[in-house]
Structures are given as C-alpha cells and as structure tokens.
Amino acid sequence: MNAKIIALLIIGGGLGALTRYYISGVLPVYKDFPIGTLIVNSLASFLLGYIYGLLFSGFDISPEWRIFLGTGFCGGLSTFSTFSYETFSLLREGEIWLAFANITTNILVTIFLVFLGFILARR
C-alpha cells in the first residue's frame, strides 16, 4: 500500500465519518428507533451499489476514485458496529420487537438500496 492509497482512504473515510456524525446528530431517535444509523447505512449502500453499477456498465472509474468513494467514503459513512450496539442496547432494555425491527429493516433496506443503486447506474 502506497502513500497515495493511504491518503485516499484517510480523506475518504474521514469525510464519510464526518457525514455520518453530522447526519446521526441532526436526526433524532424516533420513538427509541435508531433512525440515524439506518439512514447513513442506507446512503452508503445506495452509493456503493451505484458505483458498482457504473463499473459494470462500462463507466470508467479510476482505481483511485473507487478506493476514495467505495472503501473510504462509504466505509466511513456506514457503521455496522453502531448498528450492532444499538440492537444490543434495545435487547438489553427489553425492546425485543424494536431490536427485531432494527435488524430486519437495516438488512432488507440496505440490500435493496445496493440493488437499486446498481440498477439505476446501469440505465
């Protein structure tokens, strides 16, 4: 790994993390449901699907941009660990149905948004 790749990852990941921090801070928790985490994971999933859709349709995205946007920005924007902790917290608080809704919603929505981004990019 060279210095250019490291810089792209640091900058992309940092911008993604700042975006996640801002979005999560602006959005309130909706009736104990961690909506901010769902939104940042959804945005990252859609963007990553869109990037790969462009690649599969023959759009030329340089390896540097793929690293910056995909691994860096989308990696910094999304957060599996926060999703896991929030689900654990809901379970610990006895909110079994909210925990189940959090798991189901995050997984189904993010997979669908990868698919949607992929399809929209290929049009």
Curated annotation (Swiss-Prot):
GO cellular component: plasma membrane
Transmembrane segments: 5-25, 35-55, 67-87, 100-120
Major place of residence: membrane
Membrane topology term: Multi-pass membrane protein
Subcellular location field: Cell membrane
Originating species: Pyrococcus horikoshii (strain ATCC 700860 / DSM 12428 / JCM 9974 / NBRC 100139 / OT-3)
Keywords annotated in UniProt: Cell membrane, Ion channel, Ion transport, Membrane, Metal-binding, Sodium, Transmembrane, Transmembrane helix, Transport
Protein name, per record: Fluoride-specific ion channel FluC
